[in-house]
Amino acid sequence: MTYKATILAIFMIILVLGIGTKETRGQETCHDLIMKRDCDEATCVNMCQQKWKGSGGSCFQNFNVMSCICNFPCQV
């Protein structure tokens, strides 16, 4: 009886670890450049939240132009 219980316990551990690995997969960060000039922080955040359903955005300097980039979890 203990042999079957040990095999079952090992199987359950592998199953739980496999499920945990599947949930973390696909959580890479994707980026989208929305505005290519004249970035305003509040507008950038609003546009990113509307387009990507709650994901934030930020302004960054792209050469001599302020651009808006959105960061969001990639969908696989």
UniProtKB/Swiss-Prot annotation:
<keyword id="KW-1015">Disulfide bond</keyword>
<keyword id="KW-0929">Antimicrobial</keyword>
<keyword id="KW-0295">Fungicide</keyword>
<feature type="disulfide bond">
    <location>
        <begin position="30"/>
        <end position="74"/>
    </location>
</feature>
<feature type="disulfide bond">
    <location>
        <begin position="44"/>
        <end position="68"/>
    </location>
</feature>
<feature type="signal peptide">
    <location>
        <begin position="1"/>
        <end position="26"/>
    </location>
</feature>
<keyword id="KW-0964">Secreted</keyword>
<dbReference type="Pfam" id="PF07333">
    <property type="entry name" value="SLR1-BP"/>
</dbReference>
<feature type="disulfide bond">
    <location>
        <begin position="48"/>
        <end position="70"/>
    </location>
</feature>
<dbReference type="GO" id="GO:0050832">
    <property type="term" value="P:defense response to fungus"/>
</dbReference>
<protein>
    <recommendedName>
        <fullName>Putative defensin-like protein 121</fullName>
    </recommendedName>
</protein>
<keyword id="KW-0732">Signal</keyword>
<dbReference type="GO" id="GO:0005576">
    <property type="term" value="C:extracellular region"/>
</dbReference>
<dbReference type="InterPro" id="IPR010851">
    <property type="entry name" value="DEFL"/>
</dbReference>
<comment type="similarity">
    <text>Belongs to the DEFL family.</text>
</comment>
<keyword id="KW-0611">Plant defense</keyword>
<feature type="disulfide bond">
    <location>
        <begin position="39"/>
        <end position="59"/>
    </location>
</feature>
<dbReference type="GO" id="GO:0031640">
    <property type="term" value="P:killing of cells of another organism"/>
</dbReference>
